[in-house]
Protein backbone atom coordinates (compact mmCIF):
# COMPACT_ATOMS: atom_id res chain seq x y z
CA UNK A 1 0.00 0.00 0.00
CA UNK A 2 1.33 3.41 -0.91
CA UNK A 3 -1.11 6.23 -1.57
CA UNK A 4 -4.86 6.40 -2.22
CA UNK A 5 -5.69 5.97 -5.90
CA UNK A 6 -8.64 6.26 -8.21
CA UNK A 7 -8.89 3.97 -11.23
CA UNK A 8 -10.77 6.68 -13.11
CA UNK A 9 -7.67 8.92 -13.09
CA UNK A 10 -5.36 8.09 -16.05
CA UNK A 11 -2.38 9.60 -14.20
CA UNK A 12 -2.71 7.33 -11.17
CA UNK A 13 -0.50 4.56 -12.59
CA UNK A 14 2.43 6.96 -12.91
CA UNK A 15 1.81 8.32 -9.43
CA UNK A 16 1.69 4.80 -7.98
CA UNK A 17 5.00 3.97 -9.66
CA UNK A 18 6.58 7.16 -8.36
CA UNK A 19 5.30 6.49 -4.86
CA UNK A 20 6.61 2.93 -4.92
CA UNK A 21 10.03 3.99 -6.18
CA UNK A 22 11.86 1.27 -8.08
CA UNK A 23 9.07 -1.24 -7.54
CA UNK A 24 6.22 -1.34 -9.99
CA UNK A 25 3.12 0.10 -8.40
CA UNK A 26 -0.41 -0.70 -9.42
CA UNK A 27 -3.73 0.94 -8.68
CA UNK A 28 -6.05 -1.65 -7.16
CA UNK A 29 -9.31 -0.63 -5.58
CA UNK A 30 -8.77 2.40 -3.32
CA UNK A 31 -5.00 1.99 -2.82
CA UNK A 32 -1.74 1.91 -4.73
CA UNK A 33 -0.17 -1.51 -4.17
CA UNK A 34 3.60 -1.95 -4.45
Swiss-Prot record:
General function of this protein: Toxin with unknown function in healthy organisms. On glioma cells, interacts with chloride channels (probably ClC-3/CLCN3) and MMP2 at the surface of glioma cells. This complex is then internalized via caveolae, thus inhibiting the chloride channels necessary for cell shrinkage and tumor propagation. Inhibits migration and invasion of U87 glioma cells expressing CLCN3/ClC-3 voltage-gated chloride channels.
Secreted in keyword set: yes
Tissue specificity comment: Expressed by the venom gland.
Keywords of this entry: Chloride channel impairing toxin, Disulfide bond, Ion channel impairing toxin, Knottin, Secreted, Toxin, Voltage-gated chloride channel impairing toxin
Subcellular location: Secreted
Additional free-text comment from the UniProt record: Negative results: intracerebroventricular injection into mice does not induce neurotoxicity (up to 1 ug doses).
A single GO molecular function term of this UniProt record: chloride channel regulator activity
This protein's record includes keyword Disulfide bond: yes
SUPFAM superfamilies, per database record: Scorpion toxin-like
Domain notes: The presence of a 'disulfide through disulfide knot' structurally defines this protein as a knottin.
Disulphide linkage map: 2-19, 5-27, 16-32, 20-34
Protein name: Chlorotoxin-like peptide AaCtx
